[in-house]
Amino acid sequence: MAQLCVALVAGEASGDILGSGLMRALKARHPDVRFIGVGGPLMEAEGLQSYFPMERLAVMGLVEVLGRLRELLKRRKLLIQTLIEEKPDVFIGIDAPDFTLNIELKLRQAGIKTVHYVSPSVWAWRQKRVLKIREGCDLMLTLLPFEARFYEEQGVPVRFVGHPLADTIPLEADRPAARAALGLGEGPVVALMPGSRGGEVGRLGALFLDAAERLSQQVPGVRFVLPCANATRRAQIEQMLEGRQLPLTLLDGQSHQALAACDAVLIASGTATLEALLYKRPMVVAYRLAPLTFWILKRLVKSPYVSLPNLLAQRELVPELLQDDATSEALANTLAPLVRDGSQQTERFDEIHRTLRRDASNQAAEAVLALLKDR
């Protein structure tokens, strides 16, 4: 059999992690496989020949995208031309749908097999994107089971491979060891996780600290940990802490240690809610957006829930306090009983963890190779 050539494109750090795991699993089955495309340091370490730095694709927010649109479109056009000339056996677009779905469509029209790894949130909003996916994608690989059901209903070939986080996070976290590592003793501990982006922390940081002050009056001896995504976020939080007397430890990164150590979490909606679920920590989910953005999204979003635990459970498993409902008083009052006993939430968390724990990288590799069995 001729040497297998796999093209991959990842647009951000989370895609680099997924891509490197998939590449490792493919190499275990085809040691001489050749990898081309765009990826980060982890994918390059697995042998990817990256055409340009992945950072050029990692753009957040509408305004930033508009500022770089000409460059992004030029890079995409050149990438499509290069890949059509190279004729890989398969192209795998990892997340970054606004960049990769168009590549998949053009390559499939040129006779190259295409796979999309990580579903965009088409089940929640901009559902018409599924038409583009159906046209441009030979196979969709989803991390979550409800996504796979959506694609089956839409007639898109799909495989639910499980979530890599569910593979790496243990079914039972060692709370005493995590507390010892962070210098925390006995007594109730609450993790505050207001997000990793500047805008999120700007909208939620002070609110979460206000809620923590209220919670201190309701739960005797409670302490708080707040993992900061980077030095900029830490400086932002430190400014908000001026003049407050909170028993709070700021951490640099270490969000997984914070989740392992705590009894409950006050958390921004996002991927971190899945991490909290996998650590079996009861949570209250909060989110605030700019008023106009919230008004628009409220009309676009088709899903009754915003947090991953509720989407996975298909019911309100964890409280969601959004926009004007997210007051410091409401957050503290909702969180206080969960610090004492959150077992009603966490029993279901264990069941969900086991559903998602499927050895995702190997499942994804098997699905890709099954697509190529007749090459």
From Swiss-Prot:
SUPFAM superfamilies membership: UDP-Glycosyltransferase/glycogen phosphorylase (SSF53756)
> Which gene name does the record give?
lpxB
What PANTHER family does UniProt report for this protein, alphabetically?
LIPID-A-DISACCHARIDE SYNTHASE, LIPID-A-DISACCHARIDE SYNTHASE, MITOCHONDRIAL-RELATED
Outline what the protein does: Condensation of UDP-2,3-diacylglucosamine and 2,3-diacylglucosamine-1-phosphate to form lipid A disaccharide, a precursor of lipid A, a phosphorylated glycolipid that anchors the lipopolysaccharide to the outer membrane of the cell.
The lineage's top-level taxon is: Bacteria
* A GO biological process held by the record: lipid A biosynthetic process
Provide this UniProt record's keywords sorted from A to Z: Glycosyltransferase, Lipid A biosynthesis, Lipid biosynthesis, Lipid metabolism, Transferase
Q: Name one GO molecular function term.
A: phospholipid binding
Q: Does the keyword Lipid metabolism apply?
A: yes
Cellular component, GO annotation: membrane
Question: Is the keyword DNA damage assigned to this protein?
Answer: no
UniProt-listed InterPro entries: Glyco_trans_19
Q: What is this protein called?
A: Lipid-A-disaccharide synthase
Check the record and name the HAMAP family matching this protein.
LpxB (MF_00392)
- Pathway(s): Bacterial outer membrane biogenesis; LPS lipid A biosynthesis
Q: Give the family per the record.
A: Belongs to the LpxB family.
Enzyme Commission number(s) of this protein: 2.4.1.182
What reaction gets catalysed by this protein?
a lipid X + a UDP-2-N,3-O-bis[(3R)-3-hydroxyacyl]-alpha-D-glucosamine = a lipid A disaccharide + UDP + H(+)
Concerning Pfam families, the annotation shows: LpxB
